[in-house]
Amino acid sequence: MPTPFISFTRRLLGLAVTLTVGVALLAQSAQRDYSPTDITAETLPKYKEAMDAKPPNYPSALAILNTLQAKVPADSYDMAYLLQLKLQVYLQQGEYAKAIEPMERSLTLSEAKNPTFFDERVTRELYFFLVQLYFQEAAQTKNTTLAASYFEKADKAMVHWLKITPQTNADAQLIYAQLLFSRGMVNTANPDNDLLKRAIEQVDIGLKLATRPKDTFYVLKLVCLNQLERYAESAELLESLVKLKPDNTAYWQQLAAIYLTIAAKYDETKELQLAREFNIRSIISIERAQTNGFMNSPKDNYNLVGIYFNIAQYEKAAELLANGLKTAKIENDPKNWELLALSYQQLQQPLKGIEALKDGTKAFPKSGQLEFQIAQAYTSLDKPEEAIKHIQAAIAKGDLTKPYQAYLSLAYTAYSLQKYEIALEAARKATEFPEGVKDGTNMSKALEDLLRDRENKKNRT
């Protein structure tokens, strides 16, 4: 889940300068005949001296403002003016949370008057930065109830800003979209889909306003669409993005992944033809990316093999996997050799599967599991003499996923070859594993009876 993308600190540091100029111009406005009273005007030099000190004496500046606030009417221009100066102090200190209260109060005082204390430009700037302050506090707190409250305030402030702003801009729309998304995801276990839809609407407005839209617009829209499970729209957007920016590897990866997601959804609903279609689209996306020089990692190459295998294109899967293992384009891992063998088995080429497993044992000479896979392949071909050698090699090497299976397999194979002593020993070993107790015990009893009968017959003769 993305976090707020904007840098509040840089913007808010600039606000102090903006407000200093804005407040100074208030008294000069032709429509507004407001100015500080004498008591405020006479005390301001002390405030300025504290702020101009190197470093600024913030405690002294705040003390001067607090003293003045106690002396002026609560609804006066002086109060609004002093609140503006106070929020400047907090902003310069980096105390952004503390700047919220004087900003809110000064706006309330201004808008209660006609004409307002602050002109339209300053009012818009104050609301816009108030949005960002709320947003920052919401994003930083771990208290979800408090976060929800700040997000709601930020949303309302942004709605008001849009109402009083003649023309919005792309950056503002991005902030609003991020705000709505973050608000919608306060409860990640139960996201607010209506807020996510609103976030998409604001992204779309921003995209129309931007000459060269930031990637953040697209990232945010994709996250919202995916959260809403509107995967077809995500795929459509990503198709546009890879054409617009074919050198962006992240877009190629997301495109291939979204097609797989859609395929999985159709698979769940048993719409197998559609599932196959979107698996193929994922394959094509990966191959397009590789043509552009992306998605060539061993993991990407393995994923491509996996998709081919899942849609029963075993010949292509085997071709890519064999070549990948040979050229190190796919990780040299025992499981991958097993998958290669399985691909050949699906193609009714068991001997090639066995050869693949034997190649795997050359790469992993200590892997008992690969030896056991070879043994099973020979068993399926009704070649117990070959099978038993590899079962015994598998047990000797160890590293088996399910050792009891190897012992039971040895017991049955040895029995078929009338090597009863070997079979009995293997059956007894199988009982040492919880999963092998039942079959191992039954096999042991049968073999013991057989050997006993054989011994009795021998003695009688």
Regions found by a protein language model. Name each.
Residues L12, V17-Q132, Q136-A139, T144-E152, ...:
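N-terminal leader/linker segments that initiate helical-solenoid repeat arrays
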